[in-house]
């Protein structure tokens, strides 16, 4: 009789994504994956972020609970409910403050719904203690891979950069399976007393107290670092990616991350790609947060034109009558050869198109996984966050991309590389595009990333490494919910 009762019960998981597309998109996919394994999944988000999840809720894959975002109380503009809208360092601090102010409201929602588990973004450091109050496990979601997690932990623990003579002097990151060299200029720089730095420091200690970590990666991509994270750093972790593979239908891929209703047929860029030869087009996109200075955009435009390669370029700029960031006559000369998209683009569908030969990326983890999954080589251009670590995985460990020469971590997401010192020159862009698209090196790089892409697909299939890890986690959470107590 007890077994019958247990089988009738359904595991209910709450998901709390950080309010930024790069965090919300993969956590939505993760909720869909848990749902496909029989769990009831509820995402908690704010009113202005709700449209991001509307398609999944309409299909009945997930449920949605709204929570008020305290923009005004934190000193933010009333409609600022996403980190994608942050334009200054001061706004970043206020946004972090706002994420702490929602804690009591979230606690009330938990009390009302009583889920069996909480999956919360790493930026919500308070979520572990809140989950403990309700005697449910809190799972961490970082939004990056094992390599970056290991590298950042080593840098924070050992401080190998503290006694260098200059920002450009290199150092070896200690206690890693490979010899990885970096410079101080490539590391995150936040004032010690900033809200963001306080949160990062607290996150390490709180992560150790959480039930475990969900990682959007697959074992075959970073086996040494998956083992290192678990055995050397002692973290309990499950690899369940690439989570984007949960979107199997064309419509799901087209709508992923879009607030507007969107279908593949509506995207002219896909029709444009249909007219191109296989592996002939360079796709250029720097994610949802990076806003380059006009001077850097001019270098990109000139470098792309000089390369002679066809391209699709996603630019976060509204069209104006006079655009100083474009070389004179650029769009006229590039007709049929280059396509500029000034809005959201269906990235997964673009990368999966046979015409795409390379991807110029900011090395956000979602973008790297999507490129690997599609078997597309990369030109790496890290900007902030853990992106300089991610670049090392791509260019040195797997050799599935070439660096463009970005050397300086950006403190602000806006007007990136406005100063001459950090700007990537057109010659470097042209050279990187040529390296990744033409010659023997390009062929070898493409072969390596294609093999990884096949491994990625196998990992999420029944019996694959990610499928098995997710199944084991769901089984463990069911046992905790219906057969035991949180350890």
Swiss-Prot record:
This is UDP-glucose flavonoid 3-O-glucosyltransferase 7. PROSITE patterns: UDPGT (PS00375). Belongs to the UDP-glycosyltransferase family. Keywords: Glycosyltransferase, Transferase. Disulfide bonds: none annotated. The gene is GT7. The lineage of its organism: Eukaryota, Viridiplantae, Streptophyta, Embryophyta, Tracheophyta. CDD domains: GT1_Gtf-like. PANTHER family: GLYCOSYLTRANSFERASE, SCOPOLETIN GLUCOSYLTRANSFERASE-LIKE. Optimum temperature is 45 degrees Celsius. It is an enzyme of class 2 (transferase). It comes from Fragaria ananassa (Strawberry). It catalyses: a flavonol + UDP-alpha-D-glucose = a flavonol 3-O-beta-D-glucoside + UDP + H(+). Broad spectrum multifunctional glucosyltransferase. Catalyzes the formation of flavonol 3-O- and 4'-O-glucosides during fruit ripening. Accepted substrates include several flavonoids, hydroxycoumarins and beta-naphthols. Uses UDP-Glc as a sugar donor, but not UDP-Gal or UDP-GlcUA. May also be involved in detoxification of xenobiotics.
């Amino acid at each position: 009789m007890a077994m019958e009762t247990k089988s009738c019960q359904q595991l209910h998981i709450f998901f709390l994504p950080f309010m930024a597309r790069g965090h919300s998109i993969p956590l939505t996919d993760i909720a869909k994956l848990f749902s496909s394994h029989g769990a009831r999944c509820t995402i908690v988000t704010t009113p202005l972020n709700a449209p991001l999840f509307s398609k999944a809720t309409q299909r009945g894959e997930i449920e949605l609970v709204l929570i008020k975002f305290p923009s005004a109380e934190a000193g933010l503009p009333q409609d600022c409910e996403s980190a994608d809208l942050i334009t200054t360092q001061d706004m970043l601090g206020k946004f972090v403050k706002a994420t702490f102010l929602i804690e009591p409201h979230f606690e009330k929602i938990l009390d009302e719904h009583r889920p069996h588990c909480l999956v919360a973004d790493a930026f919500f450091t308070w979520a572990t203690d809140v989950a403990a109050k309700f005697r449910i496990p809190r799972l961490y979601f970082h939004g990056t891979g094992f390599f970056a997690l290991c590298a950042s932990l080593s840098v924070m623990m050992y401080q190998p950069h503290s006694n260098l003579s200059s920002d450009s002097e290199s150092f070896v990151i200690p206690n890693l399976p490979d010899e990885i060299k970096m410079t101080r200029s490539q590391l995150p720089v936040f004032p010690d007393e900033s809200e963001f730095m306080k949160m990062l420091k607290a996150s390490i200690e709180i992560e150790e107290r959480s039930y475990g970590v969900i990682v959007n990666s697959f074992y075959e991509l970073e086996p040494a670092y998956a083992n290192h994270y678990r055995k050397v750093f002692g973290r309990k972790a499950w690899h369940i990616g690439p989570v984007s593979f949960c979107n199997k239908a064309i419509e799901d891929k087209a709508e992923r991350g879009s607030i507007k209703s969107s279908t593949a047929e509506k995207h002219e860029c896909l029709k444009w790609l249909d007219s191109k030869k296989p592996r002939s087009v360079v796709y250029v996109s720097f994610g949802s947060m990076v806003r380059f200075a006009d001077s850097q955009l001019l270098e990109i435009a000139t470098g792309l034109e000089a390369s002679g390669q066809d391209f699709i370029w996603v630019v976060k700029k509204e069209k104006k009558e006079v655009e100083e960031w474009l070389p004179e006559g650029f769009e006229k000369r590039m007709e049929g050869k280059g396509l500029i998209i000034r809005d959201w683009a269906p990235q997964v569908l673009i990368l999966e198109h046979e015409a795409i030969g390379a991807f110029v990326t900011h090395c956000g983890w979602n973008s790297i996984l999507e490129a690997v999954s599609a078997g597309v080589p990369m030109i790496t251009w890290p900007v902030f966050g853990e992106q300089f670590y991610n670049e090392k995985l791509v260019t040195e460990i797997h050799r599935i991309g070439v660096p463009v020469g970005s050397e300086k971590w950006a403190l602000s997401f806006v007007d990136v590389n406005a100063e001459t010192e950090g700007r990537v020159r057109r010659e470097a862009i042209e050279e990187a595009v040529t390296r990744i698209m033409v010659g023997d090196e390009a062929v070898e790089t493409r072969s390596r990333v294609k093999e990884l892409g096949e491994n990625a697909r196998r990992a999420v299939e029944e019996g694959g490494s990610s499928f098995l890890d997710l199944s084991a986690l769901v089984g463990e959470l069911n046992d905790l919910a219906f057969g035991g107590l949180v350890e």
